[in-house]
């Protein structure tokens, strides 16, 4: 397979992964602030769908293409910037896995509240808080990965 084509797919995939994460987080966070169960239920459904379509596929493709590229380019996975990129990716993925479950729970709570004409219950806010708390280290991890991939060095390493 052509090296440039795989690099292109790797960059495109990382863009989809990061863009989907930022976009869905933005919309779910701000619609949640309205406390409008009907609006939240609609947006949460789309967020869950986008996560499965874009995030799940790219979270599988990224390490596969990255390891292939490193091997093809003769880079050891213990090269500091590559090693720490992998660590950051593992952290981000470890945050994402419970986030998926939380998003489905947020969706279900909002759908139930909207269907019964009730407000979002306190359980929604608790789940949203956990979702936000997990999103922060994932975001920082992805920003660090982008830096290391471009600079080919570890930030703050001197």
Predicted region positions:
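Polytopic transmembrane helical bundles with strong interfacial aromatic enrichment
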Residues: 1-158
């Amino acid at each position: 397979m052509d090296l440039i084509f795989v690099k292109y797919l790797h960059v495109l995939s990382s863009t989809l992964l990061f863009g989907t994460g930022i976009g869905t987080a933005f919309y779910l966070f701000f619609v949640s602030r309205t406390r409008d169960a009907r609006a939240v239920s609609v947006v949460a459904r789309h967020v869950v769908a986008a996560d499965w379509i874009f995030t799940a596929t790219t979270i599988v493709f990224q390490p596969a293409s990255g390891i292939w590229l490193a091997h093809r380019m003769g880079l050891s996975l213990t090269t500091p910037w590559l090693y720490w990129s992998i660590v950051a990716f593992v952290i981000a993925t470890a945050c994402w896995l419970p986030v998926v479950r939380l998003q489905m729970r947020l969706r279900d709570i909002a759908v139930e509240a909207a269907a019964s004409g009730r407000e979002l219950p306190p359980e929604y806010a608790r789940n949203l808080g956990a979702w936000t708390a997990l999103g922060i280290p994932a975001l920082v991890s992805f920003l660090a990965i982008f830096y290391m991939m471009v600079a080919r060095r570890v930030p703050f390493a001197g």
